[in-house]
From Swiss-Prot:
Described function: Converts a single cis double bond at position 12 of linoleate incorporated into phosphatidylcholine into conjugated 11-trans and 13-cis double bonds. 16:2(9Z,12Z), 18:3(9Z,12Z,15Z) and 18:2(9Z,12Z) are substrates for the conjugase to form trans-Delta(11) and cis-Delta(13) double bonds. No activity on the cis-Delta(9) double bonds of oleic and palmitoleic acids.
Subcellular location: Membrane
Cellular-component GO terms for this entry: membrane
Histidine box-1, short sequence motif: residues: 105-109
Catalytic activity as recorded in UniProt: a (9Z,12Z)-octadecadienoyl-containing glycerolipid + 2 Fe(II)-[cytochrome b5] + O2 + 2 H(+) = a (9Z,11E,13Z)-octadeca-9,11,13-trienoyl-containing glycerolipid + 2 Fe(III)-[cytochrome b5] + 2 H2O
Lineage, highest ranks first: Eukaryota, Viridiplantae, Streptophyta, Embryophyta, Tracheophyta
Domain of life: Eukaryota
Pathway connected to this protein: Lipid metabolism; polyunsaturated fatty acid biosynthesis
One BP annotation, GO: unsaturated fatty acid biosynthetic process
Keywords: Fatty acid biosynthesis, Fatty acid metabolism, Lipid biosynthesis, Lipid metabolism, Membrane, Oxidoreductase, Transmembrane, Transmembrane helix
TM regions (residue ranges): 52-72, 84-104, 117-137, 179-199, 222-240, 254-274
Protein name: Bifunctional fatty acid conjugase/Delta(12)-oleate desaturase
EC number: 1.14.19.-, 1.14.19.16
InterPro entries for the chain: FA_desaturase_dom, FAS_N, Fatty_acid_desaturase
Length: 387
């Protein structure tokens, strides 16, 4: 996956790759969001209910096919093939589930249709089926889009300044510990974020997507959190009944492992879109909405780009115009490159190599403290890894 290493920036009609350690341009952009929007064909902002549903149906056909093959054929396979078939099913089904996760996430952005009720019903059913509290996540994710790359207000994968790093972390930077951290992050990171705000924005009190009194939510969002929780309870009850009827092992093989694969992809995708050794974070003295949202990176997941409905390689446009449907984002990305110039970022590094690099290099953030640093750069924080 990926067509080359190094972060790609544009200059006019050509593109160049930054050398490792070279920083992106972080000066305030010389264009506005309205100028970017003018470069995009108007039809890219149009949402088609029928076309959006076609992607849901398409994904359900694939998911049903994979389920049918596994449920009706795997027990007939010779014993050695049995151990190859199940991991293949888990990867394929988890990938399709990730595509459905992306569609539900688009519903939360009002990118599915022109009808909010339709968007919320579809998004609620899809996300709830994966044990995700739809409305609760919709609210916190909206905050992420409103505060991207803000050191104080971004909602998820917020890097810590060096002074706030745990004392023991310096013992976790060796390769074996890094492998363990990556594994735990991918498998448990998503549910731990939802349940306990792990890797989320710092709040003074307990924070959870399942607690309507969490500081994430306002008083008028209380009912939405309870509706989300009721949906999760219903799915847990359904899983309990399935386990009673078919056995826990069946539920784990057919549902739990693919959902875990989906969770891993969600963490991998969302973390790598805003984390790179060349990327800054801003404190309140330097941050603004456009500047923060341009700290976003398109990446290449190969054929999985299509399976994931291009959320991976059109993430820059998605952050600038989150209500744009995914099926128009590729055309919009091509259109905005000329306006964004060196503010458009793409990294074709093979994705697992990129993940290893980012986990190794992006440990904490600090501003430049040398004497040559300007006063404005004091509010610009860069990733570092020397503890």
């Amino acid at each position: 996956m990926g067509g080359g290493e190094g972060i790609e920036v544009r200059s006019g009609s050509s593109s160049t790759k930054l050398a490792f350690g070279e920083r992106i341009t972080h000066a305030k952009p010389p264009f506005s969001i309205s100028q970017i929007k003018k470069a995009i064909p108007p039809h890219c902002f149009q949402r088609s209910l029928y076309r959006s549903f076609s992607y849901v149906i398409f994904d359900f056909i694939f998911a049903s096919t994979f389920y049918h093959i596994a449920a009706t054929n795997f027990h007939r396979l010779p014993h050695p093939l049995h151990y190859l078939a199940w991991p293949l099913y888990w990867f394929c089904q988890g990938s399709v589930f990730t595509g459905l996760w992306v569609i539900a996430h688009e519903c939360g952005h009002r990118a599915f249709s022109d009808y909010q009720l339709v968007d919320d019903v579809v998004g609620f059913l899809l996300h709830t089926s994966f044990l995700i509290p739809y409305f609760s996540f919709k609210i916190s994710h909206r905050r992420h889009h409103s505060n991207t790359a803000s050191l104080e207000r971004d909602e998820v994968f917020v890097p810590k300044p060096k002074a706030k790093m745990p004392w023991y972390f310096k013992h976790l930077t060796n390769p074996p510990a890094r492998v363990l951290i990556i594994f735990i992050t991918l498998t448990l990171g998503w549910p731990m974020y939802l349940a306990f705000n792990i890797s989320g924005r710092f709040y003074e009190r307990f924070t959870s997507h399942f607690d309507p009194n969490s500081p994430i939510f306002s008083e008028n969002e209380w009912l939405q959190v309870h509706i989300s929780n009721a949906g999760i309870v219903a799915v847990w009850y359904l899983l309990y009944k399935l386990a009673a009827a078919k056995g826990i092992a069946w539920v784990i093989r057919m549902y739990v492992v693919p959902v875990t694969i989906m969770n891993a992809f969600v963490v991998l995708i969302t973390s790598l879109q805003h984390t790179h050794p060349s990327f800054p974070y801003y404190d309140s003295t330097e941050w603004n909405w456009l500047r923060g949202n341009l700290v976003t990176l398109d990446r290449d997941y190969g054929i999985l780009n299509k399976v994931f409905h291009n959320i991976t390689d059109t993430h820059v446009v998605h952050h600038l115009f989150p209500s744009m449907p995914h099926y128009n984002a590729m055309e919009a990305t091509r259109a905005v490159k000329q306006v964004l110039g060196e503010y458009y970022h793409f990294d074709g590094t093979p994705i697992f190599k990129a993940a290893w690099r980012e986990f190794r290099e992006c440990i904490y953030v600090e501003p430049d403290n040398d004497e040559g640093a300007s006063s404005s750069s004091k509010g610009v924080f860069w990733f570092r890894n020397k503890l």
